[in-house]
Structure formats: C-alpha cells, structure tokens
Swiss-Prot record:
The lineage of its organism: Eukaryota, Metazoa, Chordata, Craniata, Vertebrata. Its EC number is 2.7.10.1. Glycans are attached at residues 51, 102, 135, 244, 314, 417, 438, 534, 607, 622, 640, 747, 756, 764, 900, 913. Receptor tyrosine kinase which mediates actions of insulin-like growth factor 1 (IGF1). Binds IGF1 with high affinity and IGF2 and insulin (INS) with a lower affinity. The activated IGF1R is involved in cell growth and survival control. IGF1R is crucial for tumor transformation and survival of malignant cell. Ligand binding activates the receptor kinase, leading to receptor autophosphorylation, and tyrosines phosphorylation of multiple substrates, that function as signaling adapter proteins including, the insulin-receptor substrates (IRS1/2), Shc and 14-3-3 proteins. When present in a hybrid receptor with INSR, binds IGF1. PubMed:12138094 shows that hybrid receptors composed of IGF1R and INSR isoform Long are activated with a high affinity by IGF1, with low affinity by IGF2 and not significantly activated by insulin, and that hybrid receptors composed of IGF1R and INSR isoform Short are activated by IGF1, IGF2 and insulin. It catalyses: L-tyrosyl-[protein] + ATP = O-phospho-L-tyrosyl-[protein] + ADP + H(+). Found as a hybrid receptor with INSR in muscle, heart, kidney, adipose tissue, skeletal muscle, hepatoma, fibroblasts, spleen and placenta (at protein level). Expressed in a variety of tissues. Overexpressed in tumors, including melanomas, cancers of the colon, pancreas prostate and kidney. Residues 1-30 form the signal peptide. Changing Y980F: Reduces tyrosine phosphorylation. Abolishes interaction with IRS1 and SHC1. Does not abolish interaction with PIK3R1, nor with GRB10. The chain crosses the membrane at residues 936-959. Residues 491-609, 610-708, 735-828, 834-927 form the Fibronectin type-III domain. ATP binds at L1005, G1006, Q1007, G1008, S1009, F1010, G1011, M1012, V1013, K1033. This is Insulin-like growth factor 1 receptor. Residues 999-1274 form the Protein kinase domain. GO terms for biological process: amyloid-beta clearance; cellular response to amyloid-beta; cellular response to glucose stimulus; dendritic spine maintenance; immune response; insulin receptor signaling pathway; insulin-like growth factor receptor signaling pathway; negative regulation of apoptotic process.
Length: 1367
C-alpha cells in the first residue's frame, strides 16, 4: 500500500537514482550506494561496499555466524552513511577500523529506534576502531552485550555527538578488565590528547595505536584537517585542505556540484537531507516507477516522495503541491489490491485516507470497544473504488465507524458480481443510521448471510438508499439466516486423513452433499490449542465477540470428486490442537431450521522441533578449578525436554597482555573471577554486605527507593522494547527449509568442533606464545536438572560456556542453538609461586645472572617478575618483564659491589603477586690484586700531574690577586684560613664584564639575598639596543669577601642560560666596588606577589580579573618550558616555587634569578635539625626522606606551583606546621583540590604528585599535553619548539633515584658511616661557607653541606639552596 505517510520506493527506482548521482554529483572515484545496504549470512556480501563513498540510507551487517578473517576486506572510500549503522552477531569481526578506516560522518537522517549507531551482541568485537569518525549528526549510540568489547571509556563521545545523555552503553567488557592503553602511555610518552568525562581527565583514543582526533580550540565547532588546520565552516567531519569548501569530506548543510553550500542554489532542491538536485533529477525518479504511480514532488525547495500534511498535488501529473481546501484528500492504495483490516494496527495504515484505491476486507474477530479506534483510522474514507467485504467480524455491532463512506464504485467485484458482501458477523446489529446517511453503490450487488442479529428490514433499507434495489436475487438476501439466531446441524462430517509436521496440520474430510448442492456455500474450519481433551464448540464465545477458536474459510473444490481439505500453518511445535469443521449451507427443512453439517472435535498434536535456547545462564566459580553453571529451561521446549549439552572452551588471553611491558606500577590490568553463590542442590541468593545507616558490620542491603525501582522498571521495559524492535527489524521470514537443513544447522557446532576427550585434558594444555590460540571445546551431558559443575579447569582462566537444550527428538533433529556465558575461575593459592630453586651464574664486570623456572599453571598469565636483592645494608628491587624472561630465561644484575648478597624472586600474574622464593646466596668477588696493581700504576702518574697542575694554578691566581690594587676597597684581604680557598673559589672576569660607567641606577626594587636590588639603565648590554632597563643586584657593604665571591659565582650560573623563559643575565661588574650583577628587568615582580595582587580583596589590585583557565595553562606552559631547558642542560632547580618565578611587563612568567626573592619569603623555608633552610612545602617525598633531588622532584614542585596559581598564592598545606607537612607528605598525603579549580588543571597537578617519581611526567611531556592550549607566540620563543630541544640518548635520561647518591639531610654525616635520616650530630663543617650554601664545583667534598642534593650524576648540576644570614 502506498499512503501519505509510509511506503518506500522500489529498489529499482533507487538503483537508477544512485547510478545517475554517482556519475554527476559526487567528486570522487566512488559511488553513492543505497537506498540501504543489508549484509547478512554471508561475509562475501561485503563486496557490495567496494566502490561506495556515500551510503544514502542505512548499513546493516548482521547474522554472519561463521568466523572469518576480515583483514582482507577494507573499504577506504566509504566516508558517509546518511542514516544509521547497525552491527549484530557478526562472528570473527574484531574491529571496524580495518573495514571502514575513513568513515567520518553518520548523519542519522533516519534512525534505528532513535539510534544512529547500534552495536549489539558482537561476541568477538574487541574495539570499535572507527578512528576517523568525527560526527554523528542526529541520534544517539547503543552499544550493548558485546562481551569482549573494550576501548569504550577512552572515547569521548561528546566530541562526536551534540548530546550524550541518550547514549546506551551497557553489558560490555568491564573497563577494569580491559586494560585500555592509549598510544604511548606504556612508554610514558603519551601521544593522545586529554578530555574530561565524568570528572575523569584522561587520554582519548580508539585503540592501542589510534588516538581520537581533536581539533584545536581555535576552530570552535568547525572541522579540521589531519594537520589541525581549520576547515571551511561548511565542512563536516574533516577536510583535505583548510578553508576550502570544495575539499570537505562531508557537508554541514548541502552538497552541490562539488561544493558545500549553506542552502541549495536557485533551481535546485534539497534531497535526502544532504545534497541538492535539479528538477530533471526528480523527474528521473518519476520515470523509474510504474505509470500509475504519482512519484516524487517538489515542495518548499525539497524533492520529496509526497506532499506534506495540509497539501495536495496540483493535478495528477504535477510535481508541485498546493494547500488543501478543508481536509486534504488523500489517496491510499494497496499493492495487492485488497486491504485486510483484521486489527487496529492494520487499520492504522489507513489513517487520513479519503480515497481508497482497491478492495476493503474487514475481518475483526475479537476486541472490545474497538469501534472508536476504527473510526479514528478509517472515519475519513469517502470512496472505495473496489468492493467492501465484511465477514467473521464478531467484534462489530455497527458499521458506523465508516462515518464518511459515501461511494462504493464496484470497479472490481467478488465472484457473483458482489460489491458489498456481509457474511457471518455474529453481533452485527446495525449498518448505518440511514436517516443521516447517503451511500451509493455504483456497480454490483449486495450479499448478506449468517448475520443472526441483523434485521432483514435493515438490509432492505440499505437497498433503497444505495440504489441497488432490484439487482439482488432471492438468495442474495437470505431471510432465513439473517436476523435469526437459530441453527441446527443434522449431518456429521467425517475426517478422512490427517498429516502433521512441526508447525503444520493437513486435514481432509468427506465431501458433504446436501439435498440441493447449490445451497452448499463453503466450509469453515475451527481450531485452537487444547492441552486437555475437554473443549466444547462454545468455549470462549460471548456477546462481545470474543472467540477463542481460530477460523479458516475453505472454498468448495472445483472438482466434485476431490475431498475438501485445509493446510493449517503457523502452529506451535509439539502442541495439541482441537479441530472441527462446519459446512455453511442454505438448505431449509420443513420446520424452518437451517440444515447443515459439522464434524466431531478432533484432537491432534504437531510434531516435535528443535527447542529454543536455555534461559538466564549464570556461572560462578567456587574454586580455582571449578565453575558452577545454572540456567532455566527453554521457553519453548518443542517436545519432551530430555537433557542439556554443556560445552566449554578456554579463551585465549588478550593479545596486548603479551605485547606490553608491565614493569611499571599502577599499570597492571585487573581481572576478576566469577564470584557469587550458586548452590548445587538449591539456588539461593547470597545476601549482600553493606554499611547501612552509618554503622559498620554486615547487614541487609539498603532498600531501593521508589524512584530507583521505577527507573529500573522503565529501563527494563525500554530494553525489552528495543530488543523486540531489533529482532523484528532484522529477522525476516524466508522459505521453509528442508528437515536435513535444520538438523545440519543445529548440529554444526555440536559435532564439527567436538572431540572425544575428558575434561581433565584441559588442565594439561600448555601456554604457548601464540596470541590467538583456538582452544578445543569440551562437552558433557546433563540430565533432569538445570545446573552442573565443570571441573578440572585451569586457575584464574576465562572460559566460554555454551548450554544447548535437547528434547526427545534430538537424535533426529539436533539440539537447540546455544545460550552462553563467560566466566573466570578463582585464582589458585600458590599457583604463581616459582616452583624450583633459583640458581645463579657469575658474569664479568661485577655481574651475575639469575635463573629460575616459570610457574607451571599460573593464575591466567605471568606478567612480570620482581627480584629483591641486597647485601647487609638495604634491599634493592629489579623488575623483569615477561618478554625479557622468555628471551633470556632469567635476569642479569649489573654493577654489584663486591660482597655477599641474597636474592629472592616473586612472580606477578593477572590475579596478583605470588610468594617470594627462598633466598639464594651469592658472592661477588673483588678484583684481583694484580688488577689493582695495574690500576695503581696507571692512576699514580695521573694523580701526581693533577696535584702539580693544581698547585701551579693556585700560585698563579694568588700572585695575580695579590697585585690587583682594586681588590676589596683597596685593602689586601687577609684570610684567617688561607688554605681554604681554591682556584675554583676565585672569580675571573670574562666576556660578561661591563664597564661601571655604562650603568645608571634609578630606584630601589627590594632586598635580595646579598643586598639591595635596583632598577636602572644599562648601555650596550643588549645587541641593537642603545639603552636597556635592567635590574641591578648589589652586595651589602658589610659583606665578607667570601659572600662577594659567592655572589659572583651565583651570577656565573646564569651565564650558561639562554632561554626566553629563564630570567637572563646581561652582565657583571666585578672590577671595583660595589660589585654589580646586571639582570633582565621583570617589572611585575615575583609570581607569588603578582598572584596575590590579583585577589579581589587586595587594595592594590590593578583592576585585573583572576586568571582564566587559558591564562593559568599559559603560565604553566611557560614555567614548564623554562624548567625543561634547565633539565636539558643538566640543572636541577631544587627550589621551584611561585616566589622564585618572575613576571615580565608582557605578563610572561620566567624562572627567577635564583636568589633575588628568597629572603623576602624566608617563612616559606624550614630549618631541619638546626641546619640549612628547606622549602618543605614544595619538596617531594623522596627529597624529604632521602635528600634526593632530581628533575622528578622539580616536577613535584611544579605541581605545587600550579596549586599556587589556582589559589592565587595561598600557602600550601595551610594549617599544618612544617614538621606536620614533612610527615604528611612522606606518608603519601597530597594537597586538596582548590575551590573552583578546573579539572584539567587539577589533573595536571595530580600527575606531578605521583608518589613514585618514575610515574611523574617530564617537563617536555607536560608541555606536549597542553601545547594546543598555548598562545601562538609560544611556538616562536619556547625551548620546546626550538632546534636546541633534541631528545638525548636513553642513557642520559636515566635519573633514577637508585642511580643517585642517597645521603641523609644531615650535612654533618660522616664519610665512614651513614646515619639514619632522623639523626643529627649538631656539628658544623669546620671550613667553608655557612650552612645552606652550595658552590658549584666539578666534584663535591663529602663534608660540604647538602652536596648530596646535586643528584648522583657526574655531569649534572644543582642550583644553590636558599641562603640565610641567620644560619
């Protein structure tokens, strides 16, 4: 039927449409395919997509039960689907990324039950992988019941859809079991960008090697190219060139002649919601249909199938619409010419129709108060071109629901020239109200029979009104069976044969011969389900028209010698039916009773069939080698249920578990076994244990609220409706198959992959390196119960368990399809223990090689091993990955000092850690005396030369200093301890020297570490600048010679820095007094003061708003860039804080000049044990605990600086004393999230505060994660984007704490023994500078305070700790 609201164009029509479109409209080598592509049962049908660029319609891929290798199928041309994408039960498909690598847009022009992307029951799908999918224009996504599907939590759907609230992602693999890893995260070099989902700021990717594409924020809602260049505003999804409306992958609005346009040009029309076509294109669609079809129309600038509501065609051959005068006439047509109305649903198809082309057959057998519904849907019909037949409509009392019917043309008539036929309507009492009704029957006769409640006078009145009086013969309006509820059947019909199958019954009966054979009209067969043989003819009938019997009319055989019969189909297998037959005759006997015939009630059962699948399969593990499985019987046993077949198969481990190196904490994937309680004899609920009402201890589960119950109920109903809709949409009927086909399908999985073996065999299967091993199925038979226990399984291993139902005909028909469940066994205690002894072999250069056997049956899979070894002092740990162990069979320990050692080894599997092995003892020998003698011969001359050279240099420098008349205000310096000074302590003027007359001081800026800091002007210190505003640092007049030399040495540190984000040294005035250091002027002071000035309550607030998120990120990037430069030049800052960052005139933040601001904020430091001042509130746990300072500890301090920025320079750990802060941080405490702090900024802080230093990002990685948020000028001036930023060799980045000298904070620690960290001797170094001062040297005196804080690398330097004159 084609009506105003429904019906689609034939496939041939669309074929012509898409062929012409492919040749003329789309500017690629591909085609526009459609109107919808349905690929089912055979994976080779995928070839239909080979040349498709756009699918104008939907794409179904479903019901492919045989697992295939899809890697050879790739469709890179496909970029757009205009409607929706549906995937359902496709075996073997693991990712969509290879199939559709360039699918970019799903428009959702028409949806599948409100969804544009549906992925349902895809058992092998491991990831979606549509890494180029950028836009789903309309509709939501539904991803459900995909047992192995991961990488769902790593996709930010808000970047693809406008709204994510209607998305439904349920029943997939739990994220904790997936171990989703975005590209580069395992190597700690993440490549993907981060976004926030449900308050979780994380990397976004589609697979382990494909990031989710995000466009720069500067693009707004525009798409972008692969190189992050913004597309033209009319582009959707992506483009091949920036700002080019001819280079779009898809169009935001409409596509025409190779260009994306906001609206269709003149003389073109919108089509299918995405492109523009001309009038001839619409006309070509018309010509493709049959001649009597009205085809497409053009209305309101759109080419569409029919006029919208309120409009009608302007003539039968017109392509244009005009407004209706009053209700619009609407012509409806049934393709089969006859429309059967047997329910409200079928009547609904006629809603709004005024003219019906064809015949109406009304057959409403049951239903209460159905007339109002029929009137809503059929009340506007005015004309029927064919005939109207009303039969067996026991629910009808009147025909008034056809309230506007005024003309029956009778162009097509029933046999006998009938155009109005009313037969066997048990409750029909009235036709129409003829006082207010004009109905014309233009051609044909009327026929009325077997309407016991319809008065003959009502029929005669209709004759007069309709103009048919005189057309009917005497038998057409039978006065004996209309209006008379009497009937008596005197003859008995006898069945002659019955034949049954699983859903059919064929019956025949004796031919009935009434006295006048002409009065035999037909037969009616009545049948119904009858579990018991106690039904009667009148069961289920009432005055309202309810009737429990199904009725089928059987026409008389044309050959009088053939016995009448009927095929009843659509029956249920293995079901007993009651059947009887009644003859419909007009024969009258003398007492005016109707003469007829009927049979006795016959009981007959259909044949058995394959049962439906078992229901509600559950599995739980009660030990490391057993799984308990429980299920419910099938809803349709289709026979006498006899037994069940239980089959199980070990599942291979996920491939990434073999590929990744898990020697990093917090990155080991989590697996859970199938917990729960299933009792073998009786299934009982395991009561939950929760904390209710604030009281601890086990108690009942807290009751759900009414709102929660209602929400769960609605969700369950919605899920059921969706599944029904899904199954009704994709399961289409096909011709009945032969029985051998049914048997073959039912037994395919049961026989082809089974083998005759016992369950015990599964325990001895080895664990090969083959990632996707196909393990065999094992099976057992379960009789007379719905539960079983599977034994002899491997510990902590995932199994697939299939349950098949089998009835008494299983040998012949086969068993049901399977219902399956995945379950994991419990871990076995001791399974991860290393079974044999640990052995060792000596290796050259103070190394040994440890060997040990692998656990035989581990809990799932061994991921790594951990070695704990050491001598008498402290144990060290070494991690050995699975790959390394498989390659070498053990591990090598290098660079061991001579002595006795013990070592123990522990394995880590998917379930956790095993036990430590018994210790193995080994001895590392010292080098032989001969070797020592050789070394001594080599080293002695070198030492003598160094000593002599040092003495010569000292004498030269001393002589030069002595003759320098301008030293120390013209007075010679007499040292109390002349042996203390070395050549390294004396400052030698160099190219940084500036003449004093070029410096002019103007005003004081503040007090520095050594003296006052002034603002001034320097001439010629910056190239191409005659005069430059500078900061001038001085030394107090009362400063000692040591302090003056230290002042100049600290300035010398700055000579090596040349970075935009580090405050620059411009020159030094060391000749004469006072000594001056010329620095870059930072007019806005230190960052701490600047941030506090932005507080609203500050009186000196320069009317500047608090920094926005983008400004905070800009500050963070500038600080990180300066720190990355220091790190690249082997400097460890050790005192990174807001007070030590400076703010320039243009608000650029730079790393400070390492001394200018420290005395101002001396309260930010803490003196531990009476020694040097320490910035404990900015220090990392390892720095507080072991005195280790590395670039990782600088990253921790950087996180605290971010916290200062977010709080406008509040004091960290406010409310805690310095001692409390020290303990709090060493015990793992962290700063709380500041109020109104953006998630992105706080997530960056948390990354910097990882307790394990190795887990913290480097400064370069920090910049990489926020580089898209930085201002464009950052690229021009930063170290990150400079040529100087070259990645060093891996050896150079090895700043591991274990490779560094770890000495307690006590500066008086003896060189002979290392005291515990909390012991303090209270002694000071006898010679040298005051506590807390660190002079940069080539090597450090062990007794020099805080020398150990420089880190443990010879080529790495540390910046000085803060000074204090009070030390």
């Amino acid at each position: 039927m084609k009506s105003g609201s429904g019906g689609g164009s034939p496939t041939s029509l669309w074929g012509l449409l898409f062929l012409s479109a492919a040749l003329s409209l789309w500017p690629t080598s591909g085609e526009i395919c459609g109107p919808g592509i349905d690929i089912r049962n055979d994976y080779q049908q995928l070839k239909r997509l080979e040349n498709c660029t756009v699918i104008e319609g939907y794409l179904h891929i479903l019901l492919i039960s045989k697992a295939e290798d899809y890697r050879s199928y790739r469709f890179p041309k496909l970029t757009v689907i205009t409607e929706y994408l549906l995937l359902f039960r496709v075996a073997g498909l693991e990712s969509l990324g290879d199939l559709f690598p360039n699918l970019t847009v799903i428009r959702g022009w028409k949806l599948f039950y409100n969804y544009a992307l549906v992925i349902f029951e895809m058992t092998n799908l491991k990831d979606i992988g549509l890494y180029n999918l950028r836009n789903i224009t309309r509709g939501a996504i539904r991803i459900e019941k995909n047992a192995d599907l991961c990488y769902l939590s790593t996709v930010d759907w808000s970047l693809i859809l406008d709204a994510v609230s209607n998305n439904y992602i349920v029943g997939n693999k739990p994220p904790k079991e997936c171990g989703d890893l975005c590209p580069g995260t395992m190597e700690e070099k993440p490549m993907c960008e981060k976004t926030t989902i449900n308050n979780e700021y994380n990397y976004r990717c589609w697979t382990t090697n494909r990031c989710q594409k995000m466009c720069p924020s500067t693009c707004g809602k525009r798409a972008c190219t692969e190189n992050n260049e913004c597309c033209h505003p009319e582009c959707l999804g992506s483009c091949s060139a920036p700002d080019n409306d001819t280079a779009c992958v898809a169009c935001r609005h409409y596509y025409y002649a190779g260009v994306c346009v906001p609206a269709c040009p003149p003389n073109t029309y919108r089509f299918e919601g995405w492109r523009c076509v001309d009038r001839d294109f619409c006309a070509n669609i018309l010509s493709a249909e049959s001649s009597d079809s009205e085809g497409f129309v053009i209305h309101d600038g759109e080419c569409m199938q029919e006029c919208p509501s309120g409009f009608i065609r302007n003539g039968s051959q017109s392509m244009y619409c005009i407004p209706c005068e009053g209700p619009c006439p609407k012509v409806c047509e049934e393709e089969k010419k006859t429309k059967t109305i047997d329910s409200v649903t079928s009547a609904q198809m006629l809603q709004g129709c005024t003219i019906f082309k064809g015949n109406l057959l009304i057959n409403i057998r049951r239903g209460n108060n159905i007339a109002s519904e029929l009137e809503n849907f059929m009340g506007l019909i005015e004309v029927v071109t064919g005939y109207v037949k009303i039969r067996h409509s026991h629910a009808l009392v009147s025909l008034s629901f056809l309230k506007n019917l005024r003309l029956i043309l009778g162009e097509e008539q029933l046999e006998g020239n009938y155009s109005f036929y009313v037969l066997d309507n048990q409750n029909l009492q009235q036709l129409w109200d003829w006082d207010h009704r004009n109905l014309t029957i233009k051609a044909g006769k009327m026929y009325f029979a077997f309407n016991p409640k319809l008065c003959v006078s009502e029929i005669y009145r209709m004759e007069e009104v309709t103009g048919t009086k005189g057309r009917q013969s005497k038998g057409d309006i039978n006065t004996r069976n209309n209006g008379e509820r009497a009937s008596c059947e005197s003859d008995v019909l006898h069945f002659t044969s019955t034949t049954t199958s699983k859903n059919r019954i064929i019956i025949t009966w004796h031919r009935y011969r009434p006295p006048d054979y002409r009065d035999l009209i037909s037969f009616t067969v009545y049948y119904k389900e009858a579990p018991f043989k106690n039904v009667t003819e009148y069961d289920g009938q009432d005055a309202c028209g309810s009737n429990s019997w199904n009725m089928v009319d059987v026409d008389l055989p044309p050959n009088k010698d053939v016995e009448p019969g009927i095929l009843l189909h659509g029956l249920k297998p293995w079901t007993q039916y009651a059947v009887y037959v009644k003859a419909v005759t007009l024969t009258m006997v003398e007492n005016d009773h109707i003469r007829g015939a009927k049979s006795e009630i016959l009981y007959i059962r259909t044949n058995a069939s394959v049962p439906s699948i078992p229901l509600d399969v559950l599995s739980a593990s009660n030990s490391s080698s057993q799984l308990i499985v429980k299920w419910n019987p099938p809803s349709l046993p289709n026979g006498n249920l006899s037994y069940y077949i239980v089959r199980w198969q070990r599942q291979p481990q996920d491939g990434y578990l073999y590929r990744h190196n898990y020697c990093s904490k917090d990155k080991i994937p989590i697996r859970k076994y199938a917990d729960g309680t299933i009792d073998i004899e009786e299934v009982t609920e395991n009561p939950k244990t929760e904390v209710c009402g604030g009281e601890k201890g086990p108690c009942c589960a807290c009751p759900k609220t009414e709102a929660e119950k209602q929400a769960e109920k609605e969700e369950a109903e919605y899920r059921k409706v969706f599944e029904n809709f899904l199954h009704n949409s994709i399961f289409v009927p096909r011709p009945e198959r032969k029985r051998r086909d049914v048997m073959q399908v039912a037994n395919t999985t049961m026989s082809s992959r089974s083998r005759n073996t016992t369950a015990a065999d599964t325990y001895n299967i080895t664990d090969p390196e083959e990632l996707e091993t196909e393990y065999p199925f094992f099976e057992s038979r379960v009789d007379n119960k719905e539960r079983t226990v599977i034994s002899n399984l491997r510990p902590f291993t995932l199994y697939r368990i299939d349950i098949h139902s089998c009835n008494h005909e299983a040998e012949k028909l086969g068993c049901s399809a399977s219902n399956f469940v995945f379950a994991r066994t419990m871990p076995a205690e001791g399974a991860d223990d290393i079974p044999g002894p640990v052995t060792w072999e000596p290796r050259p250069e103070n190394s040994i090689f440890l060997k040990w056997p692998e656990p035989e049956n581990p809990n799932g899979l061994i991921l790594m091993y951990e070695i704990k070894y050491g001598s008498q002092v402290e144990d060290q740990r070494e991690c050995v990955s699975r790959q390394e162990y498989r390659k070498y069979g053990g591990a090598k320990l290098n660079r061991l000092n001579p002595g006795n050692y013990t070592a123990r080894i522990q394995a880590t599997s998917l379930s956790g850690n095993g036990s430590w092995t018994d210790p193995v003892f080994f001895y590392v020998q010292a080098k032989t005396g001969y070797e020592n003698f050789i070394h001594l011969i080599i080293a002695l001359p070198v030492a003598v030369l160094l000593i002599v050279g040092g003495l010569v240099i000292m004498l030269y420098v001393f002589h030069r200093k002595r003759n320098n008349s301008r030293l120390g205000n013209g007075v010679l310096y007499a040292s109390v301890n002349p042996e203390y000074f070395s050549a390294a302590d004396v400052y030698v003027p160099d190219e940084w020297e500036v003449a004093r007359e070029k410096i002019t001081m103007s005003r004081e800026l503040g007090q520095g570490s050594f003296g006052m800091v002034y603002e001034g002007v320097a001439k010629g210190v910056v190239k191409d600048e005659p005069e430059t505003r500078v900061a001038i640092k001085t030394v107090n007049e009362a400063a000692s010679m040591r302090e003056r030399i230290e002042f100049l040495n600290e300035a010398s540190v700055m000579k090596e820095f040349n970075c935009h984000h580090v405050v620059r040294l411009l020159g030094v005035v060391s000749q004469g007094q006072p000594t001056l250091v010329i620095m870059e002027l930072m007019t806005r002071g230190d960052l701490k003061s600047y941030l506090r000035s932005l507080r609203p309550e500050m009186e000196n607030n320069p009317v500047l708003a608090p920094p926005s998120l983008s400004k905070m990120i800009q500050m963070a990037g500038e600080i990180a860039d300066g720190m990355a430069y220091l790190n690249a030049n082997k400097f460890v800052h050790r005192d990174l804080a807001a007070r030590n960052c400076m703010v320039a005139e243009d608000f650029t933040v730079k790393i400070g000049d390492f001394g200018m601001t420290r005395d101002i904020y001396e309260t930010d430091y803490y003196r531990k044990g009476g020694k040097g001042l320490l910035p404990v509130r900015w220090m990392s746990p390892e720095s507080l605990k072991d005195g280790v300072f590395t670039t990782y500890s600088d990253v921790w301090s950087f996180g605290v600086v971010l916290w200062e920025i977010a709080t406008l320079a509040e004091q960290p750990y406010q409310g805690l004393s310095n001692e409390q802060v020290l303990r709090f941080v060493m015990e793992g405490g962290l700063l709380d999230k500041p109020d109104n702090c953006p998630d992105m900024l706080f997530e960056l802080m948390r990354m910097c505060w990882q307790y394990n230093p190795k887990m913290r990002p480097s400064f370069l990685e920090i910049i990489s994660s926020i580089k898209e948020e930085m201002e464009p000028g950052f690229r021009e001036v930063s170290f990150y984007y400079s040529e100087e930023n070259k990645l060093p060799e891996p050896e150079e980045l090895d700043l591991e704490p274990e490779n560094m000298e770890s000495v307690p904070l006590d500066p008086s620690a003896s060189s002979s023994s290392l005291p515990l960290p909390d012991r303090h001797s209270g002694h000071k170094a006898e010679n040298g500078p005051g506590p807390g001062v660190l002079v940069l040297r080539a090597s450090f005196d062990e007794r020099q305070p805080y020398a150990h804080m420089n880190g443990g690398r010879k080529n790495e330097r540390a910046l000085p700790l803060p000074q204090s004159s009070t030390c």
